[in-house]
């Protein structure tokens, strides 16, 4: 899914599910805060469901306590399916984005940027 956006995971990153079926929501929120404070790119799966409609917004609000609202983010819906869609947006826009269980969300770090319309987290190599 990440390749649909460009190269958002080309440095350290963390993956988390927003499903609270097996993990309490309070623990998930604690982990999201730690991830945001670590300045790692985040990959979020199970971002929303009918029962958890507000979890992605709440997760974004937690991240915005640490990172600016214009942090580069992205989403890919229906990865590998005929109706696959992907987009790049800001953290503030992501907070209001209507994700579903078929969506994977990516929140960039302080180095993530948009290059030629793609979400890119550089590894620090210099082009010579």
Language-model-derived ranges and their functions:
Residues 37-128:
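A contiguous loop/helix-start segment that scaffolds small-molecule binding in enzyme catalytic cores
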